[in-house]
Amino acid sequence: MGILIALIPAIAWGSIGLISGRMGGTARQQTLGMTMGALVFGLALWAVEQPTLTSKIWLIGIVSGLFWSIGQGQQFTSMKAVGISRTTPISTGMQLVANALAGVLLFNEWHGNMYWIGSASVIVLIAGAVLTSLTDKTDPNRSASENWGVGIRALILSTIGYAGYTIVVHYGNVNAQAVVMPQAVGMLLGALIWSFKDKPWVVKATYRNIVTGLVWGIGNLFMFMAMAQIGQAVAYSLSQMGIVISTFGSIYLLGEHKTKREMVYVVIGSILVIVGGVALSLMKA
């Protein structure tokens, strides 16, 4: 059941870049709008479930949300710099490394042969992520607007933010449903701090991205439910299989250009991501 639960974030999060791309706006507008949607989801969940919110849950939730605002804001920045189909695979690989290391080193989730199987699975996942991001240097239509300096810096910061967002909650060992609303408060605070000078709250695109936040909220809830059942390393790795949705979606729905050679890279890379994810799930099962 935990494995099935972990696939829900893959679908939800794999759609985030596509939805935000359709909703439009700058990285700051998208991040603020998304956090508004996440807060709406968090408040609705709290109203239905009425979980107890202790000071510990508030602290962990807000800190986790602040980390998330760094992760998501910088990922949107990278998407603007180098495109969704290039950002998502690289970001996925970096997040998988960070969360697998956290699961093993901080939470001692793998034992004995699990080290070898888990390590091999993560390597396969990372190889798939890298393949999907490779470019065809002979393509005369390569975008001159890609800014890899900005993109890589944003991805490094994004990975730190995303790693902190999951590690804090897992380390705190708090109820998944209870932490969602405080976490959304932290996300909104972080987004407001980052975007304040641009006043994104006066732009319609910000409010359109509330939809993005609602979809993210669904994935977030099921992500932490899965972590409690099958561990951080496996749950997070499975959740990142949404790379297939975001990569192919950005090509076919948003029209990001790919040559035949790049499409071969994408197909092989996506297969490797699926194989690595399945291997991790079988290891835990």
From Swiss-Prot:
The organism's place on the tree of life at top rank: Bacteria
Keyword tags: Cell membrane, Membrane, Sugar transport, Transmembrane, Transmembrane helix, Transport
Keyword Cell membrane applies: yes
GO cellular component entries: plasma membrane
Location of this chain's protein in the cell: Cell membrane
Transmembrane feature ranges: 2-21, 31-48, 55-72, 112-134, 147-169, 179-196, 209-228, 233-255, 264-283
Pfam families, A to Z: Sugar_transport
CDD domains listed in its UniProt record: GRP
UniProt similarity note: Belongs to the GRP transporter (TC 2.A.7.5) family.
Protein name according to UniProt: Putative sugar uptake protein lp_2503
Higher taxonomy: Bacteria, Bacillati, Bacillota, Bacilli, Lactobacillales
